[in-house]
Amino acid sequence: MKTILSNQTVDIPENVEITLKGRTVIVKGPRGTLRRDFNHINVELSLLGKKKKRLRVDKWWGNRKELATVRTICSHVQNMIKGVTLGFRYKMRSVYAHFPINVVIQENGSLVEIRNFLGEKYIRRVRMRTGVACSVSQAQKDELILEGNDIELVSNSAALIQQATTVKNKDIRKFLDGIYVSEKGTVQQADE
């Protein structure tokens, strides 16, 4: 069964400006600019109102799979708005039983070097995605802080660090060493 029209709107805050170029969404805010291309999805994007403070996503004559993309695009745009206003911060903790993992940040926070993982001499180097800065926490021991405006790039960088410390040829129920995401949040606190 096909639904004639499915639509959803996203409210745009005062300090955020959104421009549409076809199906490319550009979000401008206090922390910077994000752009995302939705050309691969067949939907209509439009800005509503005189001040253009609402974004509407329309899908005509869609089946279940196609209708799901409407909410998906809205969620992506909401994440972009949150990114340019508050920013995203992921915290990661080093876990080790015996050999202390030594993490060094190089090149202004764009390269992470992991040494002494399970006592290995090999140095693991993980390059951060563009727009993601990594730093060692001053308040907490063995903690990394990843910050950026794009949630996909921040979470992807965290995944690259976690995957760099996978334990090979051992029972992973016993060898729990690695660097794992401990907390997900925003750089600035939202005013409730």
UniProtKB/Swiss-Prot annotation:
One of its GO terms (molecular function) is rRNA binding. Changing L47H: In UV-induced tumor 6132A antigen. PROSITE patterns: RIBOSOMAL_L6_2. Pfam families: Ribosomal_L6. SUPFAM superfamilies: Ribosomal protein L6. It is found in: Cytoplasm. One of its GO terms (cellular component) is postsynapse. Coiled coil: none annotated. Component of the large ribosomal subunit. The ribosome is a large ribonucleoprotein complex responsible for the synthesis of proteins in the cell. Component of the large ribosomal subunit. This is Large ribosomal subunit protein uL6. The gene is Rpl9.
